[in-house]
């Protein structure tokens, strides 16, 4: 009977190669298992109204992991020498990594709606109170002197930098609000400027802001619950319940930002995009809305503290990025701003802006907020 020769590796191949391959595979499986466990734990611990958001984020994590794996495989394949290798595309950095492809003018329908651009100034007259390089538009019975004095006060809270405890919550009462899809100044007829797709609606802007704050050491949570879907009616009651449960679970939260977009439309149906240019790139303008207690229908006992925060953020943004802000709107609006002493609503552009302008504006607003909160 012929004796069997011992198994040998092919010439030039080390036994370490299959061992390393097995080790890499084992490590990848461990990382995936850990990610799945974290998503499950977060789902079980999170506020009930946010469960839908966590499921969505869990799916995003899986897709992201698959994309990373695919990218690694592609990188390995690309590393092999080729006779005519094309130049690699430039690596995107900063806010550009969030940008999306916009519709070209070739896709413009014959009956497309028109968009016009306008840069809004800080305003003048007795209604406008200077706030650093920015301003506050007073639509209340409070005197200009009272508002100016309050705006000069320090923040009513202190943010803990690099803390594991959440400091900021970003959410969206009208999460389905979205932006222009076209690169040119036109929009598709019948486009209601709303979408349940979180990659293009307000959740996309909130994600940029959240990432920017977290990168600066401000622990920030982002809730992506579609509070205005399937019904727009009751959206503020829905978002109030979400915020209350976050505050109960994370009492360390000092700031709650309700991130929206505006809708400026002319009588003839033309949509207006509030714009500015920052560092050579066009951005949507932003506007903070701060509510005031009117003693009857609008009960906001902490309106003074919220106003201090609004004024400080306005000053930081307009000083750092001249032209980015429209005047703070100080008015008898409720918007659930009774829940903390750092509750504000901010409009990031309007339905006339394209998504990339809004994403850039969200990034700039968050950078201004970092300076406001950390000094």
List each model region and its residues.
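N-terminal catalytic or cofactor-binding beta/alpha core of small enzyme domains
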Residues: 20-254, 263-268, 363, 371-375
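N-terminal Lys/Arg-rich, disordered targeting/topogenic segments
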Residues: 1-16
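Active-site-adjacent mobile loop/cap segments within catalytic or ligand-binding domains
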Residues: 323-375
């Amino acid at each position: 009977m012929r004796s069997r020769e011992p198994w040998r590796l092919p010439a030039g191949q080390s036994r370490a190669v299959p061992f390393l391959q097995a080790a890499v595979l084992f490590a990848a499986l461990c990382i995936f298992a850990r990610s799945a466990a974290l998503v499950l734990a977060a789902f079980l611990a999170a506020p009930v109204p946010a469960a839908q958001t966590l499921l969505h984020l869990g799916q995003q994590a899986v897709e992201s992991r698959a994309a990373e794996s695919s990218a690694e495989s592609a990188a390995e394949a690309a590393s092999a020498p080729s006779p005519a290798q094309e130049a690699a595309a430039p690596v995107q950095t900063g806010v550009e990594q969030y940008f999306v492809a916009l519709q070209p003018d070739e896709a413009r329908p014959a009956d497309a709606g028109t968009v016009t651009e306008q840069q809004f100034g800080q305003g003048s007259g007795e209604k406008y109170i200077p706030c650093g390089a920015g301003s506050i538009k007073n639509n209340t019975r409070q005197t200009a002197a009272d508002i100016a004095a309050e705006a000069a006060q320090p923040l009513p809270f202190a943010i803990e930098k690099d803390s594991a405890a959440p400091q900021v919550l970003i959410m969206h009462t009208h999460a389905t609000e979205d932006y222009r899809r076209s690169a040119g100044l036109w929009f598709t007829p019948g486009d209601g400027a709303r979408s349940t797709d979180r990659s293009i609606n307000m959740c996309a802007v909130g994600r940029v802001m959240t990432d920017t704050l977290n990168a600066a050491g401000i622990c920030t949570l982002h809730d992506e619950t579609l509070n205005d879907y399937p019904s727009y009616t009751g959206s503020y009651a829905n978002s109030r319940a979400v915020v209350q449960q976050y505050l109960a679970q994370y009492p360390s939260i000092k700031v709650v930002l309700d991130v929206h977009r505006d809708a400026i439309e002319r009588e003839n149906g033309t949509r207006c995009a509030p714009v500015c240019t920052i560092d050579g790139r066009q951005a949507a303008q932003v506007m903070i809305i701060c509510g005031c207690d009117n003693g009857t229908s609008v009960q906001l006992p902490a309106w003074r503290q919220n106003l201090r925060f609004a004024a400080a953020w306005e000053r930081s943004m307009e000083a750092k990025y001249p032209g980015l802000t429209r005047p703070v709107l100080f008015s008898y609006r409720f918007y659930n701003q009774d829940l903390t002493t750092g509750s504000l609503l901010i409009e990031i552009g309007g339905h006339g802006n394209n998504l990339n302008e809004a994403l850039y504006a969200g990034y700039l607003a968050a950078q201004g907020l970092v300076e406001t909160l950390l000094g």
